Amino acid sequence: MKQPKKIFTRMLINNWGGISHKMLEFHEYVNLFSGKSGSGKSTVMDAIQVVLYGSVSANFLNKAADDSKNKRSVLSYLRGAQKDGTANRGDVDFCSQIVLEIEDTATHIVTCVGAAFEVAKGDTDLKKYTYFSHSGRIPKDEYLENNVPYSIAQIRKLTEERSRSADNRGRGIRRKKLIFIRCTGKSSVR
């Protein structure tokens, strides 16, 4: 008999590093990240760490991947900073998400956990972000509306809708409050 566990089934990345939009599928047992230098292995692993550690501190990012021109930070990943000093999203306002889809192998209940960011073109540090979770799988639109990543307000709306859905594992309990962790590190109840 298999031991029940929680497994990553998929990961969605919108506007992180050199990745504009990517859905990754994971195998239950083994996942191999391979590729040439600069192909994005550390980019994906750092995205996973931002969600799992619940921190935007550069201390959790892969320091070995830094180069002389660029020190990795969450903001540099969000902007899509390149080795030549340019950035994919350097001069625009944009939103970004990193989401992990997790399935309980015993109950087959699926939950998504993630981080959502809003960055203005003039931002020199990270000002608007939130960590979130919701029941059910990654939505079919992959957190995009008209090919534009959801804002934090849209993430909040989705989370509230999912809390009332049949997919919600706590559907027998009325959840009237949702907790969002803001960039101040303090909880705010909505």
Please give the residue ranges for each predicted region.
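Extended, Lys/Glu-rich alpha-helical coiled-coil stalks
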Residues: 160-190
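Extreme N-terminal "head/tail" segments of very large remodeling/mechanoenzyme assemblies
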Residues: 1-156, 181
